């Protein structure tokens, strides 16, 4: 907005500036002038400052056509009653691209309020010539030594009526909160400790103490400043804690009869919603580990009550196992085993005795199939037609008969007919004896 709203006139006499304060006498004198040269008359505003007029650059261009053009450039000059100002870069309205603000350089008085109580939200209603309509804070006004005194001098009502979003944004940029308290020490301490709510860390909102009691969770929420979130999620936290976590408080499990324990387990498993309303719901929570133990105890007790074969007076009786062979057969088996080992001669027994003992042992072993030895190789699972000789005590099969006899003698009959002549140690196989004799030769 220029102080000289200029207008172009094509004339042979004069090009003049048309203003509201222009005088008709000058116009008449210029019309009556008979000279053939051009003159330019600029009538300054009565309220304009002489220094500001000298500083304004009004460029006059002669286009050599007989017309004098005054360049209508945008010159922003301030009046004498207005402070020096500049365009502000601290805050913008993103929704309005044509919005701009001025920022003043001058210093305010200490008693002058920082903001005007009458906030103007519309840009068209802002008077740039009026200092009270421009809602900006300069960098000089935020000095610590000079500008912290307006917090006490400004009334509380005026601060509460500040509803402009621009003012709140400006305050958040400089990171301080207006505190209208009277105590200076408390104010200085709070100025360094208090932080705006928008600056709070996001992780503080997720610090939900679901493991602690209700009193400790309330104290933690008050210290962290999460009161609204705590009130909204209190019911959900309580439900979550009651369903999935056990309390820290020691719960005493009383010894109850079997029927009452089953009722307690059923009620605690399905009636959780009824206990959510009361404060003593934490005591109703049962340790899951103890529930598993109780289930095992209940199962064992029920089995013992129903089918206990050792309890007197029950309907079921223990069936005694029947021996598959008599005592006489046991004696014969022991005698057959002890005969070859107790023989004093180192040589093998006679064929007649060996055949009789082996045949007798085979007969005995056929009756006692449950006394098999687990030592040795596992039975061959793949059937082989070449292995025609099968063991009668186990599922092993052999290609040669002597291998079958050696297997039965060593594993099933536990016979050791081969004795070392040096240390009198018995062996069931001749190859094992030969290896043993080599150990004596090395000595």
UniProtKB/Swiss-Prot annotation:
Annotated stretches, region: Disordered: 337-383
Xref: Pfam families: zf-C2H2
Official protein name in the record: Zinc finger protein YER130C
One record GO biological process: regulation of cellular response to stress
SMART domains: ZnF_C2H2
Ranges of compositional bias, category Low complexity: 338-359
Compositionally biased intervals (Basic residues): 363-378
